[in-house]
């Protein structure tokens, strides 16, 4: 009974293959569920930090207070958050002599410098960073910077971006104020990250920036979940993370590659720190992106568990760096890293990975080729060349046909319900993966029915290995050409290595069986009889048939891939002496009973090798499926909602789904013809269900909404109408929604839409007039914004026509913190503006020059009561810029000035009435469908623009 059980358990038969496959998918699914849920059950009480429970409760309370209202840099509530943090920090500092506080706002710190994000740009910024230093016991050690920004965008409460980072830093500051670290810690609670990373820029001008060498930057580009290690400087810092974060590590160099390639549109303060020579870690929440920068980035939509994950990760890192000695033998090569279900974290040098890729790309094919040569030489005398080609072309034909079908389905899906990915990526991914595997199953099973064969799986594994070898070769070349920054290829390395190894095991089995078969033939002479089989599956054979009843002469043919002999012998049923043979036979005969065999152990060796299929499956399928699914899932989870940001991203993400469906099923294809009926039906049901959902479900829900962007603009040159601009993806979503607004219907307003670049659309209509400030009379545009040319020597007769032209512009604005000046360069190859001066109320000024010229100047000030900017502009006459072509009457400078207001969720007292600051935006929020969310289009929700000539 037990022997029969073992025989049935280890045969290559449909039931066994199907069970192993379903167990693989079940295991991957359970690990996936564990990975996404386990962090919620790791409580502060389980931490090695004794004060963690209280600090987390304090952090949650601080988060609630910080996110009480919208607090972008361009709002008065930004000052409230600054003052709240400063009071908390000063209270902590008073308890320790090791803590020092520097408030940029109190110290009137400002910078005027080139804008690295804008070609020809300059930026003036008045900082209100709060910088804190905890003096370490050993001041000779390079310090650690911890950074987070406390500003938000006008449409977001900023709970995740970046409230959780800020309150995590407060908690860590509180802890180390009472437990002095070995290494000096510097905290940068910075302001105005959202519009230029300016808080980080200002910090690099602070004296304490010279104390730090490492940085931990906390950020949020989603609203919850786990905080991921987006990127790290090099393999040395990746090893620090690996050694430090033992509880729930979460990081993947796929994200890092996305940043290197520009696939991620957002940037963080980490970029500024890294460009200034700091090494460290960029840790952030990354999903869901359609709630990022919207009103749902609030405490209501996040959790203590998410806060604790970021807090705990940053704390573990800080503890390790602050307390432990760090090896000075630094490796600055980019790192390849990933975690395994939050249990383990792996990291290595991308240069090391490149070397391993080179070895793998050479060694594994050479080994496989040698086994191929040996196997071919063993069977060439009886080899059926025609049948070999019949076996060899099965998978390529099946793969190509299924690929075309899959591409057709993907195109049909992406055209019929383009944005279904925004709702969720798993449904389309499962639909395409199950379709691909079903198609291959049907085609390969049909081939097997027409012409049964032995050991197709090894041939197929070799072909899959060749395909993945090509992919790995291309990725390896990209890794080298990118200076080892192509750090997301580890999944392809694992896929090729394991599939290739499984194929080599099959080839080794062929060779071993071929050697024993040849010895058997030599000993037996001509006494061997032909091998017979009906080519049926093991489920159709009876256990009463003994393995050794197949005489040793049958082994002659066991090495062949030729067609099964369907002629019957005296025994009407035979067990394959190949991969379908039983592991143990009933009542095995003695050696004397087998005149052609001199060693019974050889028969048992062949029997064991006949079960190499299980080893091949376990090597080729479970691990590769888990790793590849993890890579595809992470990539799609991060990028799926970028399809709302442009047509290019849409194509890229759908291609990723297409490739993901193929990569997930590649290791299974060699075994697909061995699926049983129930497994095939399970795939069919999964395919039909997920495909139907993809076609029938709405792409947008309240939890996964359509994300559109809002701004209201008054262009003084075109009149005083306040034009509402709503930006979103083209697809007929915006215009019907806007036409249903009460103000549009009641006043018979026109809503006109126009195509923008990259598949976007902009719809406009005349909205309610804004009320950005208090006034005792109705507010006009001139009360809010006006321009005055204080001086201009362009037409001064004392100025040589070759001399630079100087002018001074006064921008009068109320309740304002930011403006931008654009200098237009019509008919010129080079920007004419070469010098900019920002004058202050105390008669001091900041000046910046450039021989390359300026195209833009951003102005950021702190004082709402300061109602004007004064800017000096110097530009060259066109006679110096047009290769000697004189144009004396055309030396004016064309420029445009735009100023921003970021508040909407409050009222202004106008002419004795309480009026909402931005009623047009209120109306959109009130009457838009629940499956629509709003983010800001510009720096402010309200912009006023005027173009002038100097």
Curated annotation (Swiss-Prot):
Zn(2+) 1 binds at residues 149, 161, 219. Residues 36-355, 410-426, 481-487, 636-652, 696-950 are vacuolar. One of its GO terms (biological process) is proteolysis. Its cofactor is Zn(2+). Keywords: Glycoprotein, Hydrolase, Membrane, Metal-binding, Metalloprotease, Protease, Transmembrane, Transmembrane helix, Vacuole, Zinc. InterPro entries: Fxna-like_M28_dom, M28_fam, Peptidase_M28, PFF1_C, PFF1_TM. It is a multi-pass membrane protein. One of its GO terms (molecular function) is metalloexopeptidase activity. Its EC number is 3.4.-.-. Its main location: membrane. GO terms for cellular component: vacuolar membrane. Binds 2 Zn(2+) ions per subunit. Residues 1-14, 377-386, 448-459, 509-614, 674 are cytoplasmic. Residues 556-570 have a biased composition (Polar residues). The chain crosses the membrane at residues 15-35, 356-376, 387-409, 427-447, 460-480, 488-508, 615-635, 653-673, 675-695. Residues 519-570 are annotated as: Disordered. CDD domains: M28_Fxna_like. May be involved in vacuolar sorting and osmoregulation. Belongs to the peptidase M28 family. This is Vacuolar membrane protease.
């Amino acid at each position: 009974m037990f022997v029969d059980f073992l025989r049935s358990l280890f045969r290559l038969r449909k039931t066994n293959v199907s069970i192993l496959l379903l167990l693989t998918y079940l295991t991957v699914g359970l690990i996936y569920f564990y990975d996404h849920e386990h962090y919620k059950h790791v409580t502060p009480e389980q931490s090695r930090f004794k004060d963690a429970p209280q600090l987390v409760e304090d952090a949650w309370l601080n988060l609630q207070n910080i996110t009480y209202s919208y607090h972008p840099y361009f709002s008065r509530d930004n000052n409230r958050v600054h003052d709240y943090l400063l009071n908390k920090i000063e209270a902590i500092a008073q308890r320790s002599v090791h803590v020092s506080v520097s408030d940029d706002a109190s110290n009137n710190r400002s910078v005027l410098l080139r804008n690295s994000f804008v070609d020809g740009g300059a930026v003036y910024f008045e900082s209100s960073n709060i910088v804190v230093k905890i003096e370490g016991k050993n001041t000779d050690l390079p310090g650690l910077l911890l950074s987070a920004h406390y500003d938000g965008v006008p449409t977001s409460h900023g709970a995740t971006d970046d409230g959780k980072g800020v309150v995590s830093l407060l908690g860590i500051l509180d802890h180390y104020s009472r437990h002095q670290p070995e290494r000096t810690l510097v905290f940068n609670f910075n302001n105005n990250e959202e519009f230029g990373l300016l808080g980080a820029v200002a910090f690099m001008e602070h004296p304490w920036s010279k104390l730090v060498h490492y940085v931990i930057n906390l950020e949020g580009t989603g609203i919850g979940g786990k905080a991921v290690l987006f990127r790290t400087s090099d393999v040395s810092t990746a090893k620090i993370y690996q050694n430090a974060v033992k509880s729930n590590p979460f990081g993947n160099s796929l994200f890092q590659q996305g940043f290197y390639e520009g696939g991620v549109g957002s940037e963080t303060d980490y970029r500024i720190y890294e460009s200034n020579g700091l090494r460290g870690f960029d840790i952030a929440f990354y999903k869901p992106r359609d709630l990022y920068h919207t009103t749902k980035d609030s405490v209501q939509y996040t959790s203590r568990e998410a806060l604790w994950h970021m807090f705990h990760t940053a704390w573990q890192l800080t503890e390790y760096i602050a307390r432990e000695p760090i090896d000075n033998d630094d490796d600055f090569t980019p790192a390849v890293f990933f975690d395994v279900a939050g249990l383990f974290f792996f990291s290595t040098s991308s240069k090391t990975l490149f070397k391993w890729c080179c070895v793998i790309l050479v060694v594994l094919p050479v080994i496989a080729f040698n086994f191929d040569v040996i196997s071919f030489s063993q069977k060439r005398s009886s080899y059926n060349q025609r049948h070999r080609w019949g076996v060899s072309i099965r998978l390529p034909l099946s793969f190509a046909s299924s690929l075309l079908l899959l591409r057709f389905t993907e195109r049909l899906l992406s055209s019929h319900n383009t944005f279904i990915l925004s709702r969720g990526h798993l449904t389309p991914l499962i639909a395409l993966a199950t379709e691909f595997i079903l198609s291959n199953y049907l085609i390969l099973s049909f081939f097997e029915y027409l012409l049964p064969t032995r050991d197709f799986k090894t041939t197929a594994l070799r072909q899959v290995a060749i395909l993945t070898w090509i992919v790995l070769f291309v990725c390896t070349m990209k890794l080298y050409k990118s200076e080892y920054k192509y750090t997301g290829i580890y999944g392809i390395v694992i896929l090729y290595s394991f599939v290739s190894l499984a194929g080599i095991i099959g080839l080794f089995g062929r060779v071993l069986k071929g050697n024993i078969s040849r010895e058997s033939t030599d000993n037996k002479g001509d006494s061997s009889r032909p091998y017979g089989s009906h080519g049926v599956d093991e489920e159709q054979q009876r256990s009463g048939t003994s393995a050794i009843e197949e005489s040793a002469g049958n082994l002659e043919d066991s090495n062949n891939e030729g067609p099964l002999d369907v002629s019957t012998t005296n025994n009407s049923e035979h067990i394959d002496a190949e991969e379908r043979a039983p592991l143990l036979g009933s009542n095995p005969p003695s050696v004397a009973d087998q005149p052609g065999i001199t060693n019974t152990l050889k028969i048992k060796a062949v029997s064991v090798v006949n079960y190499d299929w299980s080893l091949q499956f376990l090597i080729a399928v479970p691990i590769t499926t888990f790793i590849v699914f993890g890579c595809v899932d992470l990539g799609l989870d991060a990028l799926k909602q970028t399809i709302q940001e442009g047509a290019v991203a849409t194509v890229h993400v759908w291609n990723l789904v297409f490739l993901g469906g193929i990569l997930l099923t590649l290791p299974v294809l060699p075994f697909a013809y061995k699926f049983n009926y129930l497994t095939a039906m399970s795939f069919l049901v999964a395919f039909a269900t997920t495909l139907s959902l993809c076609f029938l479900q709405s792409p947008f829900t309240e939890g996964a909404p359509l994300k559109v962007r809002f701004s209201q603009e008054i262009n003084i040159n075109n009149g005083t109408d306040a034009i509402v601009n709503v930006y979103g993806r083209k697809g007929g979503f915006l215009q019907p929604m806007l036409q249903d607004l009460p103000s549009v219907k009641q006043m018979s307003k026109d809503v006109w839409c126009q195509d923008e670049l990259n598949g976007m659309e902009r719809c406009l209509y005349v909205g309610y007039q804004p009320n950005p400030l208090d006034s005792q009379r109705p507010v006009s545009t001139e009360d809010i914004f006006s321009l005055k040319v204080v001086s201009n020597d362009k037409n001064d007769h004392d100025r040589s026509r070759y001399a630079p032209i100087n002018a001074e512009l006064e921008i009068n604005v109320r309740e304002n913190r930011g403006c931008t000046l654009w200098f237009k360069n019509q008919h010129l190859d080079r920007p004419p503006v070469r010098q900019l001066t920002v004058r202050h109320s105390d008669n001091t000024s900041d000046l910046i020059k450039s021989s390359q010229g300026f195209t833009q100047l951003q102005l950021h000030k702190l004082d709402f009561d300061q109602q004007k900017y004064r800017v000096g502009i110097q530009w060259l006459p066109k006679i110096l810029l047009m290769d000697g072509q004189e144009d004396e009457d055309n030396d004016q400078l064309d420029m445009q000035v735009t100023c921003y207001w970021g508040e909407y969720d409050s009222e202004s007292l106008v002419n004795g009435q309480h009026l909402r600051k931005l009623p047009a935006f209120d109306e959109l929020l009130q009457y838009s469908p629940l499956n629509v969310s709003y983010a800001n289009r510009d720096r402010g929700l309200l912009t006023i623009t005027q173009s002038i000539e100097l």
